[in-house]
């Protein structure tokens, strides 16, 4: 799974076998799942 570090913003791949939840770039342990971009709904003009 790919996560995003909250401190430095780097993408981090996490090993589920070792269960190391830590950023490889800055060493931060606060990681969030990247959200998919919201789809904009088109509204027809009246």
Swiss-Prot record:
Keywords, ordered alphabetically: Cytoplasm, DNA-directed RNA polymerase, Metal-binding, Nucleotidyltransferase, Transcription, Transferase, Zinc
One GO cellular component term: cytoplasm
A single BP term in Gene Ontology: DNA-templated transcription
Cofactor(s) the protein requires to work: Zn(2+)
GO molecular function: DNA binding; DNA-directed RNA polymerase activity; zinc ion binding
Binding-site positions, Zn(2+): 8, 23, 26
Catalysis performed (reactions): RNA(n) + a ribonucleoside 5'-triphosphate = RNA(n+1) + diphosphate
Superkingdom assignment: Archaea
Cofactor binding note: Binds 1 zinc ion.
Main location (coarse class): cytoplasm
Localisation: Cytoplasm
Gene3D superfamilies xrefs: RNA polymerase ii, chain L
Stored Pfam families: Zn_ribbon_RPAB4 (PF03604)
Described function: DNA-dependent RNA polymerase (RNAP) catalyzes the transcription of DNA into RNA using the four ribonucleoside triphosphates as substrates.
Quaternary context: Part of the RNA polymerase complex.
Similarity comment: family membership: Belongs to the archaeal Rpo12/eukaryotic RPC10 RNA polymerase subunit family.
Protein's UniProt name: DNA-directed RNA polymerase subunit Rpo12
Lineage, uppermost ranks: Archaea, Methanobacteriati, Methanobacteriota, Archaeoglobi, Archaeoglobales
Gene name tied to this protein: rpo12
């Amino acid at each position: 799974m790919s996560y995003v570090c909250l401190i430095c913003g780097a993408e981090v791949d996490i090993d589920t076998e070792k269960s190391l939840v830590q950023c490889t770039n800055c060493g931060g342990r606060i990681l969030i799942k990247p959200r998919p971009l919201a789809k904009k709904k088109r509204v027809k003009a009246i």
